[in-house]
Amino acid sequence: WPGLLETMVRNLRRQEDRIRIFESGRVFSSQNGMSVERTCIGGAILGLAFAGQWDGARTGVDFFDLKGDVEALLSYGEIAHSSRWRSTENVAALHPGESAEILLQNKPIGLAGKLHPELADYYGLEQPVYLFELDLEEALARKIPHYKSVSRFPALSRDLSVVVSDEITASQ
């Protein structure tokens, strides 16, 4: 997440008040003394939940905005309905009371939560930042939607047929 956080800081310095960013790439880690490589997607949100409301409301993002974004992403693989979220407190970069593990068939495929206050201070972030990371290989190993060709016929904006008796006049 360091790259995402640095990008957020850069955008905040340019007076952006609503930031939603993501990146994808390979992540390397060590498990049982072996080097493991995974393809992941990570994202971060900060600032206003909605751009320019007519009533002037300025509601900030929260955990549920992040959860909605992650579930929308999972819906492309048609697995959002089968994913579960479980509270977790053992991720050093995330706030212990506002973090979750994302599970698919009881197997962890990602993490999501609020940036830990100490890290927020380190980066100089005064607003709450919410982050997620998904293992793309695990998420995409599930059902992938298939392409459907576009219809040859244009969409109709309206189509109305009314059948009436010949005895009825237009004025009736």
Task: Show where each model-derived region lies.
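Extended beta-strand-rich architecture
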Residues: 1-172
